[in-house]
Amino acid sequence: EFITVRADSVSGNHEIKALITVKPDTPPESRRPYTIRNIYLHDDHTLEQTTTDTIAYGKYYLISQRRSLRFETLQRGMFLKPGQRYARTDYMHTVRYMNELPIVRHTNIKFAPYGNTDSLDVILYLSQRKRYAYSAEFNAIFRSTNYFGPGMIFSYTDRNKNKGAELLKVNLRGRFEVQLVDGEVNPAYEMGLEVNYQLPRFYPSFLLNIGQRSLPKTSLTAGYNLFNRLDLYRLNSLYTNFGYRWSKNDRVQHTFNPIEVIFTQIPEASKSDEFNQYLQENPGVQRSFDEQFIVGTSY
């Protein structure tokens, strides 16, 4: 509100010259460059907050009721630092980083000038989500192979597993379906378990030196899936992947998985005579049902 921009396009060549000036009526306090003095961190601020505990870490002050977030987690995302000049880009990066933490619902930052000096205190207010979440999802499946049936997914989420905004998510899924062909009923069911653990930083940190402004995350996923065609075979699948995610802006996101492992197997004891005969008559199909162990990398 205190800056004007004048654009001059007379020069042509599809170019514009921009002249940025500060308005004459800008108050002195808005012209003054401020240096950050102290930083006050409220890790879970609520209107009903009564008693708090304040812990000093140099010029950082953690103000908390339950100490639900470790100081290192908050400091890692504070780009406004004591002794440095205030910059709006640091403010925007701080808000973006804090809002990306799974436990954080809302971020608010206030500034308090210190007396008549050019020093500024920064006050960070975080409001948290509920740490634990449970959900159930029900669906129905209709396949082109005439299989149909109900399915369900139960999810458990911990948004602050070790007080460092780590995300733990567990999915338990199941499905039952039948196939109707010429009056015959062919049943099948599927069960699966998937566990995902996510850190709001790179681990180990020395592998990728990208910086906290890119919202780094480390993810580890492992899962097991069982598919049982009761009249034909039983398919077991194990998979795991370890990788990193980061994004310098809201439009571009990078995902790099240096380790991806998939193992599938059909136990011989689960194969019916009818299924074995079908595989012998169709060698091309048989290869798709062979035991597979796949290791890869993706970006």
State where each predicted segment sits.
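Periplasmic polypeptide-binding modules associated with outer-membrane biogenesis and secretion
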Residues: 1-142, 173-178, 184, 210
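Outer-membrane beta-barrel pore domains and translocons
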Residues: 23, 42, 112-114, 127, ...
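Transmembrane beta-strand segments of outer-membrane beta-barrel domains in Gram-negative
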Residues: 12, 77-79, 133, 184-299
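Extended beta-strand-rich architecture
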Residues: 122-123, 137-155, 237, 295-299
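Conserved structured core elements
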Residues: 68, 85-92, 101, 146-150, ...
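Outer-membrane beta-barrel translocator/receptor signature
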Residues: 133-135, 144-197, 201-207, 217
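Short glycine/serine/proline-enriched coil/turn segments at secondary-structure junctions
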Residues: 11-12, 114-117, 144-146, 162-164, ...
